[in-house]
Amino acid sequence: MEKDDSILTNITLQTFASEGDVALVDKRWEKDGPAFLQRLFAAGLLSYEKGQIWNKDSKLMRFVIFKYGSPEALNRCLPIWKEVEKRMFENVVIKVTAYRGVSSEYVAAN
């Protein structure tokens, strides 16, 4: 086990109103996401992970996990995330719930 107090984690839950909203965001992300991620990684984002919530009876929920190495890295990324939200969620009905915290333990298989 490893403890690293410097890793900041953001867990975001996204709930879409329709499959059309999901498809629109996915299409936009496919087109513009790589350029946004390049900028975010340059600003200090350590990792990005997106997944489908499967223990709910809906294909309209997903999670996104972001990790940052420092508060400064997070602050450098926030303006870019504002651009991402504006571009990805324009004319989309979505509920976004975000939680930020400091990782207290991280375990990975060797």
Region locations from a protein language model:
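Glycine-rich beta-strand-turn "strand-cap" elements at beta-sheet edges
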Residues: 1-8, 41-63, 85-110
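Terminal low-complexity, poorly structured segments
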Residues: 4, 9, 33-36, 70
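Short glycine-/aliphatic-rich beta-strand segments at the starts of folded cytosolic domains
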Residues: 8-17
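Short beta-strand segments enriched in hydrophobic/aromatic residues
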Residues: 15-16, 68, 81
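Helix N-cap motif at beta-to-alpha junctions
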Residues: 19, 67-73
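Short amphipathic alpha-helical segments
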Residues: 20-48, 81-89
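A beta-strand edge to alpha-helix "cap/lid" segment located at domain peripheries
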Residues: 75-78
